Amino acid sequence: TATPMAHGSSWCNAPCKPTFFLGVLPVSICSLGADFLSSLCTQALIQFLSLPTSLLISAMYLLGQTKSIHISCPKENASSKFLAPYTTFSRIHAKSITCLDISSGGGLGVSSSTDGSMKIWQASNGELRRVLEGHVFDVNCCRFFPSGLVVLSGGMDAQLKIWSAEDASCVVTFKGHKGGILDTAIVERGKNVVSGSRDGTARLWDCGRSACLGVIADCGCSINGVAVGAADNSINLGSPEQTPSEREVGTESKMLLLAREDKKLQCVGLQSRQPVFLFIGSDAFNCCTFLSGFLLLAGTQDGNIYQLDVRNPRAPVQVIHRSGAPVLSLLSFRDGFIASQGDGSSFIVQQDLDYVIELTGADCDPVYKVATWEKQIYTCCRDGLVRRYQLSDL
């Protein structure tokens, strides 16, 4: 595994085995050839680390751009590619950044911080565009609607708000929760949204009328994460006991996934309100996401990432455990996923790649959230920085 230490560097360790330091540093090509410099730096790195011959290192130094280093150990069938940030935004917030999202067009970012602020900024350079003011206390979660012009946020004040990204006005406020809102999900184009709260309830809201359409689940414990996904035709979501409101739009054939504090992962039919499954994990569930119409991921406080098949949820498809640090964010990405943890690690797992992509830079500070747009990946961290990675640099 790798524990990020500083900009573009990591401590790499395995249980009961020697630890070594890996650095991805800026290099000036000057008059040296790129191939020669790459070979020279790789040889120096191997000598410095005194690594076993079974460990192969290849370094790629891109002219004026971010660098990456690929480390593999064929003997252990393990391989990772370490990617340094393309750029870092340090002036968006003054304190820890707890959530972020990128608009559908990739032009704007939105983030919330423990400094009490929520801001919209230019995704290309971090330049501030709007400050969204109206929540009391901290904002726990924020995300763009599919249009990219509207933002949904939830705060410790138990309020859910909708904002215009164009003029920073709050156009809708939802009230009904009795505890702080910890996560949200948007149903299709956004006429309905879902919220999960410390009060133990998950609620469905009508954006057009600023009204609650119903309590989807009452868990009796904090709901740390929520996700909405379209169900595969083979999954029985049950039938609603009452005729759904005409204000429900796009809830049919949708599943709602709830990551609960009491070590349970719950799935219900969004329209039917009927249970689909209840899975008990090793610790509190912090986050969850759908990979497909029947596959999902959920991360726990003790570092486990469960992959489940909704058609047979009793036994996990697999359990990924890289460290005991809390899994804080999971995001479906291409044919795999991106995860971030409380020890500063962020990584990408892809089915078509035989290596893991490690996103470096966070100095052991928790990486709270990951967002993507095309080949760009953004992370937010306790150190108050937004980091942007370019997958084209690999």
PLM features: what roles do these ranges have?
Residues 109, 151, 193, 256, ...:
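Hydrophobic beta-strand positions that form the internal "hydrophobic ladder"
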Residues 118-121, 154, 160-164, 202-206, ...:
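WD40-repeat beta-propellers
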Residues 94-101, 137-144, 179-186, 221-250, ...:
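Canonical WD40 repeat/beta-propeller blade segments in eukaryotic WD-repeat proteins
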Residues 87-92, 128-134, 170-176, 196, ...:
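Short C-terminal beta-strands that terminate individual repeats in beta-propeller domains
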Residues 367-394:
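Blade-level signature of beta-propeller repeat domains, shared across WD40, Kelch, NHL, RCC1
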Residues 106, 148, 190, 232, ...:
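Conserved loop/turn motif of beta-propeller repeat scaffolds
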Residues 1-99, 105-107, 230-246, 254:
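Intrinsically disordered, low-complexity acidic/Ser/Thr/Pro-rich linker and tail segments
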Residues 112-115, 153-157, 196-199, 207, ...:
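Conserved strand-to-loop turn within each blade of WD40 beta-propeller repeats
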